[in-house]
Amino acid sequence: MTRLVLIANPGTKRCEAYCRAAVAFGVMPVVVPWAEVIPAGGCLDRLGAFDEPAVVRMESPGKDTAVTRLLLAAGDPHTDWQSVPLPKGVLLHPGLQYQGFVRVLQGLRKSFDARPHLRPTACPLAVARMFDKNATLADLRAAGLPTPDFLSPEQLAGSTPLLDPDRWRVTYLKLNTGASAVGMLACRHTPAGWVGTTTILHRDGEFSNTRRVRTVTGADLSECVAFLSREGVCVQKGIPHAQLDGQNADLRVVCVGGKPVATIFRLSQHPITNLHLGGRRGDWQRCRDAIPTRYWLDALESASAAAGCFDSLVAGVDVIFEPGFRRHSVLEVNAFGDFFPGWADPAGRDLYRVEWDAIMS
């Protein structure tokens, strides 16, 4: 029987959901905590789970304070991160956390290369690339795929203003290496000035992530922009959402082996549609019926091509349709974009089973 090793944070929803699914399709995964992989810099020499042939899946390292500290230490080993307060939700040097994660992923790549008996479901360097929104957009644009206009690294490093109504009157600013809409700021220019919709909360000198989408203006908005700029920002032209069921809509396309296997409509009254931020899954058939088949197939083709830009079995591709559905853009590609409890294909398989069947085929 094929062995499965899961690098994850035990006890988190993602880890538990995957383990339950694996047991259901007849595989008992061996869970190796990120807390054991990160301090070793991705070196697997002392981790016996990797000595024998196995499929290796990496799960998100999020939702674990101890792991956050380890990532910070991997990014800056000269600071005693254990003594630094880390209240729940606080965005503590997210750019540095990413630097630490990249170093670990680089180490994992070397470890996998030295162990041909292991079959990682994603190249660690592809995971790092997908987490870098600016790099991802550049890759997608180079592949000829439709994306929002965005500021180049040269513009971000220069004196180009991040918000300029003469450039874009609707502008999205995101933590360049964030996930799940952490550090998201959607701005629109009004006669009274810029108004932002955000998941960032600034209080007592600290910036936190909040699940309560809120509106910011004036000095509060400026502080959020300054925070994003310090930590590494992706700045995109805001694209108007197509409306479904009277709400803003976009689409998550989960690709397995470069092929779309799941499409989830996300609807929200806000410009930020993530399901954990008040968005909801749209009724699939009703939403699908609203989109002419030609434009639907065009979007799926773009999602497939976007996933194909990265060496990963699984990619969650975010696609936005403009009003009328004739035009679409690829917004992001998510390395860990397959967590949709309750989804099933016509054969009754959940996403994890679909992925495992692809591995075994």
Language model features: what each stretch is:
Residues 144-145, 167-169, 308-313:
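Short secondary-structure junctions
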Residues 276-314, 321-361:
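C-terminal active-site "lid" helix and adjoining low-complexity regulatory extension at the edge
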Residues 10-11, 36, 154, 177, ...:
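Short, flexible loop/turn elements at secondary-structure junctions
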Residues 1-5:
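Extreme N-terminal starter segment of soluble prokaryotic enzymes
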Residues 73-89, 197-208, 278-282:
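A solvent-exposed, charged loop/short amphipathic helix patch at secondary-structure junctions
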Residues 166-275:
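Phosphate-binding site of ATP-dependent enzymes
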Residues 252, 318-320:
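Short, surface-exposed charged micro-motifs
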